[in-house]
Amino acid sequence: MIERVWQLVSVAVMGAGSWGTTLAKVFADAGNTVQLWARRESLAETIRTSRENPDYLPGITLPDSVIVTSDAQAALDGCSIVVLGIPSQALRTTLVEWRDLISPDATLVSLAKGIEKDTHLRMSQVIAEVTGADPSRIAVLSGPNLAREIAEGQPAATVIACEDENRAKLVQAAVAAPYFRPYTNTDVIGTELGGACKNVIALACGIAHGFGLGENSNASLITRGLAEIARLGEAMGADPRTFAGLAGMGDLVATCSSPLSRNRTFGDRLGRGESLEQAREATHGQVAEGVISSQSIHDLAVGLGVEMPITQAVYAVCHQGMAVREMVDALMGRSKKAE
């Protein structure tokens, strides 16, 4: 039985992609009434009538307590928890449209795993800047959370990070379902960096797999990838312990190893010799988050003087035209050093 500290709350999940739709189901299964916002009215109508999201989560039936709308004002009205399921590079412009519709004391929960291009801001910083919300009102949900597995009710755990521990506990209580176990912490920086950087490492693992490399290579990329994520985190003031937890190693392993991972799958196509454009076409026009984040994180690391060789290699493949063979040689030919 799930322990509850607060009463059930009203939740708005803004974004009907695979993860947003899944979390709407989780919040509903936890006993809450949920507003799920879809950008396209045609998709909202389809979900309302069929109780299924055929575009992003086919085969999963949503509870009747998930109310679907394409009207942002209706979705946000009076909700005490607002879950932002918007891609990282679209978050700023979308929030400009919504900021006056959000309740002044609502807890804002970010799902986006990325670093904003050009500004190099984390998503919680973008939310605070655009909405004017105090950082203590902004939480981050991150962990080894492959959407379809969770939507199917397979057991999983996640992290709710917020500067205000009580707000983190409020979200924890609201999203805890029999198959979904949330933990809390107050390290927003580390939680966000783990989520953003793992997409880049997952691209590297996918590239290696597509190139024909085996499990030794995959394990090496994951462990050395974690090391460089932790170095960046330390330089930015994160708690090093975060990277050994669900938002660090947990998310990294799931994303780097599963064929359900969009970033790993995208990288696999690059490793097999497809161009970025070919890989994009094969994934219905979607660019993996790690492709964009590789540039932001690379620039961030250079600015802070942090060594991130795997990120540098992925950046070179995605943005500078480096061949995969060159990427492998560059990583293996680096100067020798202690672990």
Swiss-Prot record:
Its EC number is 1.1.1.94. Its main location: cytoplasm. It is found in: Cytoplasm. It catalyses: sn-glycerol 3-phosphate + NAD(+) = dihydroxyacetone phosphate + NADH + H(+); sn-glycerol 3-phosphate + NADP(+) = dihydroxyacetone phosphate + NADPH + H(+). InterPro entries: 6-PGluconate_DH-like_C_sf, 6PGD_dom2, G3P_DH_NAD-dep, G3P_DH_NAD-dep_C, G3P_DH_NAD-dep_N, NAD(P)-bd_dom_sf. NADPH binds at residues 18-19, 39-40, 113, 147, 262, 287, 289. One of its GO terms (biological process) is carbohydrate metabolic process. Keywords: Cytoplasm, Lipid biosynthesis, Lipid metabolism, NAD, NADP, Nucleotide-binding, Oxidoreductase, Phospholipid biosynthesis, Phospholipid metabolism. It comes from the Bacteria. The active site is at 198 (proton acceptor). SUPFAM superfamilies: 6-phosphogluconate dehydrogenase C-terminal domain-like (SSF48179), NAD(P)-binding Rossmann-fold domains (SSF51735). This is Glycerol-3-phosphate dehydrogenase [NAD(P)+].
